[in-house]
Amino acid sequence: TPEEVIDLTKKDVDFLLERGAKAIVVACNTATSVAIRELREEYEKKDIPVIGIEPALKPAVLAKEHSKVVVMATPMTLSQTKFNSMLHVYEDEANIIKMPCPGLVEYIEGGMLEGPVLDEYLEKQFEPYEKSEIDAVVLGCTHYPLVKNEIQKHLPGVAIYDGGFGTAKQTRKRLTECGLLSGKESGGEVKIFNSKNTEDVLELSRRLLNL
């Protein structure tokens, strides 16, 4: 439920702040849609920048006039006011189709990034649509870029957008505005925490992130 998402997200933020985080990036479309307002109200008054992620709908719509754009996301993301407000901004410029993808996150978190089961799932998802008429697909969940190549196989030549790059740019901008941007020339350190805290899940996280 939305209430559970807000509660879990706040617990995650507190966990990271206890370990010295200077800013929070909510790298989850569902958590951003449901909880970002509450997070900003609570933590930005403590001088902690909170950056959310949004589906890359704007570049997908503006790439071609009167295009047909499919937004793949979790059912909860697509049902939230935040997403539908953004959709309303662009609905006169493109035919925007919401595609809920129940179960896709669970496939990815189970390590299923390719194979016949995933292939069949994606085929069923796109079955109701005339693929040749789709101009762009927006990946409205941060899990989905991990299976971008598999999605592309079902839609050869179709542009696929995700919000990761825009979120990275916004994070740099906010850190600069707040005087928190590191002046280090070298790269940072990556630490992975997982709520299940089991080695197989941590290993899967490293594999998914190419670490």
Place the predicted regions along the sequence by residue.
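Non-catalytic structural scaffold of enzyme domains
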Residues: 1-211
